[in-house]
């Protein structure tokens, strides 16, 4: 009896399996032992449920961190230019492929540095995707400002072209991006809860990128110009702000941040030509829910969506959970069209 009661302090699934026979009258004739075993099982189930909920919340934070990296750049470009960039997800994909190429290059040229290839891939992915973003803004998107439908169709076409280009260059199959040893394994918090090092590293990396973005937007001339153009483009131009250059640099910054998100994604899952397609819609939801151009709103919306997604999926299924989240967002936007954190100001007609 004392042993069965003592086992109730455990949170191990194996202990739960060990106690189950003691609740059966055919296996255990003593009623007091059966009652103690039932009480111990309930305690273990509560602890295991807590571990499962914490695990789902952590997975939600991990998903939210990826959505945040994708949505940060989208919030900048959409808030500044009003452009619905359907090719933004492909910046994630290009960033992930840049990480894969850096891994291959280091394996051939400098194998002693292969363990640190994600760190080398970060600036490479940022520069590549930022360059592509600035080129797209300069050559195509700039000529479509004020024409949202044409911009939507053009960026969707660019998205399809980039996907097909990657298929032609690297094949339609997923490529293997291996985690280095220092990102493998995890830390065991509870018997049924292990936090993987790669996801913890991605969370820490997202916080660094968030601080980096905040510093750029609030402590640099580019950030001041971006905020000025976002609030009143005509007035900013009258004050001497080079709006065309600001548009190009902001588009490059947003694309570069998405490229960094691609490097993070490469450490969490498969890398393939359609990688970005799975995140573009959720990224737009983050921007709309958080408030256009609002950094704090994007953070709250990204982590909130990620946690709700991961908690609802086991309970209701992936499809029904997604539908419920969409309905909740629609109802919220009807009450607050400007999102969680709207810009405060007065409009003069």
Regions found by a protein language model. Give the residues of each.
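Helix-loop-helix "hairpin" substructures at the membrane interface of multi-pass membrane proteins
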Residues: 194-271, 300
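Alpha-helical transmembrane segments within multi-pass membrane transporters and channels
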Residues: 112-159, 165, 300-305, 336-337
């Amino acid at each position: 009896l004392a042993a069965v009661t003592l086992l109730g302090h455990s949170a191990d699934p194996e202990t739960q399996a060990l106690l189950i026979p003691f609740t059966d009258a055919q296996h255990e004739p003593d009623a007091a032992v059966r009652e103690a075993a039932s009480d111990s099982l309930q305690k273990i189930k509560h602890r295991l449920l807590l571990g499962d909920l914490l695990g789902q919340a952590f997975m939600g934070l991990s998903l939210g961190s990826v959505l945040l990296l994708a949505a940060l750049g989208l919030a900048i470009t959409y808030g500044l230019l009003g452009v619905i960039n359907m090719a933004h997800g492909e910046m994630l994909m290009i960033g992930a492929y840049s990480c894969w190429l850096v891994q291959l290059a280091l394996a051939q040229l400098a194998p002693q540095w292969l363990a640190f290839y994600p760190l080398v891939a970060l600036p490479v992915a940022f520069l590549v995707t930022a360059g592509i973003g600035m080129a797209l803004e300069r050559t195509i998107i700039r000529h479509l400002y004020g024409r949202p439908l044409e911009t939507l169709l053009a960026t969707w076409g660019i998205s399809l072209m980039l996907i097909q280009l990657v298929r032609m260059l690297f094949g339609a199959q997923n490529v293997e991006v291996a985690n280095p040893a220092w990102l493998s394994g995890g830390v065991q918090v509870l018997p049924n809860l292990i936090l993987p090092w790669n996801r913890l590293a991605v969370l820490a990396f997202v916080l660094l990128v968030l601080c980096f973005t905040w510093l750029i937007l609030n402590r640099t001339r580019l950030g001041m110009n971006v905020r000025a153009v976002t609030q009143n483009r005509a007035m900013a131009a009258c004050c001497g702000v080079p709006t065309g250059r600001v548009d190009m640099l902001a588009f490059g910054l947003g694309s570069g941040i998405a490229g960094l998100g691609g490097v993070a994604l490469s450490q969490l899952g498969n890398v393939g030509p359609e990688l970005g397609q799975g995140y573009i819609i959720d990224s737009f939801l983050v921007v709309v829910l958080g408030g256009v151009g609002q950094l704090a709103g994007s953070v709250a919306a990204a982590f909130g969506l990620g946690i709700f997604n991961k908690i609802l999926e086991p309970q209701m299924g992936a499809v029904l959970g997604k539908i419920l989240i969409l309905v909740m967002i629609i109802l919220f936007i009807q009450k607050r069209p400007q999102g969680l954190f709207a810009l405060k100001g007065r409009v003069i007609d």
